[in-house]
Amino acid sequence: MILSKDIKLLPGSKVEVVIRVSKNVIQEKYNSLLQDYSSRLKIQGFRIGKVPINVIENKYSEGLKATVLEEVINNSFKEFFKEESKIPLSYATPTVKEKNLKLNLDKDFEFTFTYETYPEFKIPSFDEIDIKVEIPEVFIDDSDIDDEIKNLQIENSIIIEDEEGVVKEDSIVKVDFVELDDLSNEIVSTKRQGFVFTVGKSETYYDFDKDVIGMRINEERVIEKSYIADYKFEELAGSSRKLKIKIKSIKKRDLPLIDDEFAQDISDKYNTLDDLKNFIRSSLLNIVEEKKETLKLNKFFSTISEKLEIDIPHSMIEAEIEIAFKDAKRQNKNNMSLEEFKSIFYSSGYIGGDNLKDEILGNLKSKLIMQKMVDLDPIKVTESDVEDEMARQSKNLGVSYEEIKKFYEDQNLISYLKDDIKRERAKKKILENLKEVKGKKLNFRDFVNYKICE
């Protein structure tokens, strides 16, 4: 159907295509549609199938041409992308440039459309790169194990009334509070009732948890708070507020004893407290190894990204911004709208001290590099590879192999699983080709927060 096509690559991994369709094809489709109308159209004064062609054209010509135009464009898209290697991104629909296109049955039809495609770039071979990554020497001591035990102790505690009736560190307190104006009148919009928090452990909006220590049930207190210029909540930063707080209830955690019985209550796979501690130590060691692997991969991707010029399409950046926005929302890291989030990205790029733009573009480049490595992997994923991966997931998740297999087949996700297997291959290859340099000694807690760029 396509008589000719002219393809031009534009900045931003955008493709511009000029398509020409023969007038013979246009006329054939128009005449076919005209005959179809003629065979079933009902017009007053004529029998069905007997309406003269000229009458139909006089009445419906523009509508017929519009129908043919839509069909020609859609069929041109199908034919073009059936042969073209540069396909559109799934979230970037091809756009026809011309407005108000019309058919002229006596001329070849030409139209232009643009679309964004996957960016083209070449990854340097491992022979061309020499990446050294400094990995800290991590030690896990008894205090790290004790911290995890204490967390389990808190998780398995019960909340009871505090018979002393006095607020102290770690008390679980229910309060009513409200802001007061300069005349000590309540500002109704700030009133909150039944607010529950743990003293010294929770981040309250007004940061008053220390101010209620020593208060008793039903006691009311007016306090004044001054907030520093870079206070965590911008609305309060650099201001002073007067608050009226009333204690409604005071509770505490009844913590179980840490002994063999405690370990057995956590899981029947532990017979003694030492069994539980050994499991925790093993889990922390796994966390350390996973973190080390992440640091190495981050170093690889950041180094390769610096060497590459990747012309990332706008729609791909937009999609990555939305992913970052949803992640931040899920982690309660921002209360902005998507539009505000995008505005910051395209302007300063900073939220607080974090460079949002660098983080999002860095993550996106890492994904592109990894996908390129997956696409270039010449080794096919075999059925045996798929079965082994399903068996591994079955063991880790504690569900049957048949359930895992049924899930992937029912959700039509086998191809995604194969890509995941290739990604793991790529990660393994990266890790094998990095040179690890022993770094400074760090305890477990510091290492968990360690960044490769520090």
Swiss-Prot record:
- EC top class named in words: isomerase
Span of domain PPIase FKBP-type: 170-256
Q: Which domain of life is it from?
A: Bacteria
Its Enzyme Commission number? Answer: 5.2.1.8
Q: Catalysed reaction per UniProt?
A: [protein]-peptidylproline (omega=180) = [protein]-peptidylproline (omega=0)
Q: Which GO terms describe its biological process?
A: 'de novo' cotranslational protein folding; cell division; chaperone-mediated protein folding; protein transport; protein unfolding
- One example GO MF annotation: peptidyl-prolyl cis-trans isomerase activity
Chief location category:
cytoplasm
Which of UniProt's keywords are assigned here? Cell cycle, Cell division, Chaperone, Cytoplasm, Isomerase, Rotamase
* Protein task: Involved in protein export. Acts as a chaperone by maintaining the newly synthesized protein in an open conformation. Functions as a peptidyl-prolyl cis-trans isomerase.
Q: Which family does it belong to?
A: Belongs to the FKBP-type PPIase family. Tig subfamily.
PANTHER family noted in UniProt: TRIGGER FACTOR CHAPERONE AND PEPTIDYL-PROLYL CIS/TRANS ISOMERASE, TRIGGER FACTOR-LIKE PROTEIN TIG, CHLOROPLASTIC
Record's protein name = Trigger factor
Q: What is the lineage of its organism?
A: Bacteria, Pseudomonadati, Spirochaetota, Spirochaetia, Spirochaetales
User: Quick one: which gene encodes this?
Assistant: tig
